[in-house]
């Protein structure tokens, strides 16, 4: 069963209504996400006293989530071998049905041994993921000439997958190569 925990830090509330609205909006958004994804926040720490003398902390809501599973089904992010297909799985992050369908499809592909590494995209987008996935085993990437995605765009909820075969999931970005390079002609 999946669950999460929340910890929030917010500036001194005072009498400014907008300051009171920030924690309300953040926690309402967290509740919406929990309901949409069928995940409960089973605990939390109230750190709303995020102040020191006259200083305020930036408004922050942290979520810690777990999804217990079998150790044999856990994969790491580094590329495993040259000659594998690299695919990008993404969708509108506000479409929770599509998001959970993607996650379920990726989990099935992992269980079938077709996905051997994965990277959740961050602020640096596809380019960051490809670079960091290659570091561990010094395996490179050759991006397909016809890949037309933005290499640096932030894509919330998207994942790069290293596949042992070219599966029908997401879009193909390229292939892993034995040289530790990041090649793109496009």
Stretches found by the model and what they are:
Residues 1-3:
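Short, small-residue-biased leader/transition segments that mark boundaries at the very start
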Residues 80, 85-118:
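A glycine- and small/hydrophobic-rich beta-loop-beta segment
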Residues 9-22:
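Catalytic palm subdomain of template-directed nucleic-acid polymerases
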Residues 55-60, 70-89:
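Acidic/histidine-enriched ion/cofactor-binding microenvironments in catalytic or ligand-binding pockets
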Residues 52, 64, 78, 95, ...:
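Glycine- and other small-residue-rich loops at beta-strand/loop junctions that grip anionic moieties
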């Amino acid at each position: 069963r999946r669950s999460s925990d929340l910890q929030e830090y917010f500036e001194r509330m005072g009498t400014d209504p907008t300051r009171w609205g920030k924690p309300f909006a953040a926690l309402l958004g967290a509740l919406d996400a929990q309901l949409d994804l069928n995940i409960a926040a089973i605990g939390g720490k109230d750190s709303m006293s995020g102040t020191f003398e006259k200083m305020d902390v930036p408004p922050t809501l942290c979520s810690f989530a777990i999804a217990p599973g079998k150790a044999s089904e856990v994969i790491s992010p580094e590329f495993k071998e040259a000659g594998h297909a690299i695919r990008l799985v993404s969708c509108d992050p506000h479409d929770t049905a599509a998001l959970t369908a993607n996650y379920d499809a990726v989990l099935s592909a992992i269980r079938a041994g077709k996905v051997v590494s994965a990277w959740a995209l961050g602020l640096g987008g596809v380019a960051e993921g490809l670079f960091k996935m290659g570091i561990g085993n010094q395996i490179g990437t050759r991006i397909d000439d016809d890949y037309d995605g933005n290499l640096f765009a932030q894509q919330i909820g998207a994942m790069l997958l290293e596949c042992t075969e070219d599966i029908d999931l997401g879009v193909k970005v390229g292939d892993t190569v034995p040289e530790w390079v990041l090649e793109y002609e496009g």
